Amino acid sequence: MTPTQAAVAALKGRTNLINATTAELRKLLEEADRQILAILAAAPSDYQLWYLPQLQAEIRRVLVTLGSEAAGAVDVRQLEAWRTGAALVDQVVAAAGVRVVLPTLDVRQLTAMRAFLTGKIKDVALDVANAINSQLGLVVIGAQTPFEAIKAISALLKEATLKRGTTIVRTELARAYATANQIRMEQAAAVVPGLRKRWVKSGKREPRVTHVAIHGQEQPVAKPFVLEGGAVTMMYPHDPKAPARHTI
């Protein structure tokens, strides 16, 4: 396998990892939707008989479980993304015929990233719980029918929450991958003189125009990529120090 083939295979593996994680998130949200609809179906048909605190508590339990399970799932995948990002450097260097023994990555940054991601995922679940409470409240005061509330709640889970969760997962898994990749390259550069990195545009259907513009740009490992005519610099894709428009 050539260095280019090794890099292409690793990037494909990263994409598959992210897609598998978002699919897992979708399954968890669909299960939460089923459980919440079952709770609402068991409520009295006359909404005036609804005991709102009990309904809210039951739904909140479902969503707290969702948050914990989703956080656990993405945490495992984030670790895998971190390892894969580091392994890419090892594979490319080996494919070039260079034999090096590199130290284990310092995981302090990974630890912070894991805490951030699991916290964000749990926040998503709690935010949707509050939004659902608002929908139930509208029913109780007669502002909408139970049927309308059920439709709105399903939309919250299957559309808005899924979209937000997917954005977080894609961003943070890609960031873990790229961060580990950069750290590993810095280690390798200490023993492989002249090692350089290259910006490769993403495989998205609609990639950022500014990222497409620097496709193929090469820099020494310790130097940043230059975007927007020098107005923006990034050490790697999803660099947390870069403006949000370039990372989310």
Q: For the regions a protein language model found, what residue spans apply to each?
A:
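Secretory-pathway/luminal and periplasmic proteins that interact with or process carbohydrate-rich
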Residues: 159-163, 178-179
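N-terminal leader/targeting and assembly helices and adjacent pre-domain segments
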Residues: 1-160
